[in-house]
Amino acid sequence: MQNTTLMNKSIELFCGTGGLALGLQNAGFQHTALYEWDKDSCDNIKANIAAGFDGISDWNVYQSDVRTVSYDGLTGKINMISGGPPCQPFSLGGKAQAYNDKRDMFPEAVRAVREVMPEVFIFENVKGLLRKSFSLYFSYIILQLTYPSIVKPQGMTWEEHRTLLEQHHTSNRHGDCEYNVVFRLLNAADYGVPQLRHRVVIVGFRKDVD
């Protein structure tokens, strides 16, 4: 059993059945809360907790729509936010409507970062996110995570907001609440998993974090 007194605090959105959460737990993060909309996934985690699996006994799992989650009181208390937003808007097997798909939850990932201001965040999604047809929207996601405090005004399109963010990025006029954001396409098979599973991993570090 790990010494949780030395762990960094984290919350996870779109936690599914807890695979990413378990990996981060093993890496030294203590999950304050895990949010997932799907009941079966939540029941799966709760069954594993009840079965006494090591390291997850203190997980607090909430079956919630992340659009209703309040992060009041968490600013400065959470070191990391993680999660895997629904992949259907970008999946090769879906309709690939990106921002126009109501299941696109990247805006909620950005909201969580903006309201909690963690030291670091990590989000993963399918490799379809890197398709040429999504290039502008993907750059929009990265810009939002880089400057989460620049909120899209009511009535502004995402394309217009992207242009605004790009202008800020180019001129470097907006220094507060910035994150250094990087992304990589990774294959789980390269890390000991017996499965070809490609995922885009987006990581951001708050600029005041050394």
What are these regions (language model features)?
Residues 6-10:
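Extreme N-terminal starter segment of soluble prokaryotic enzymes
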Residues 11, 32-33:
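Conserved beta-strand positions in the Rossmann-like core of class I SAM-dependent methyltransferases
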Residues 13-18:
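Class I SAM-dependent methyltransferase "Motif I" SAM/SAH-binding loop
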Residues 19, 44, 105-108:
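Well-ordered alpha-helical segments embedded in enzymatic catalytic cores
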Residues 23-30:
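A short, Lys/Arg-enriched amphipathic alpha-helix followed by its capping loop at the start of a domain
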Residues 35, 43-75:
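S-adenosyl-L-methionine
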Residues 38:
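Conserved SAM/SAH-binding beta-strand->alpha-helix loop
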Residues 71-78, 90-210:
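Class I S-adenosyl-L-methionine
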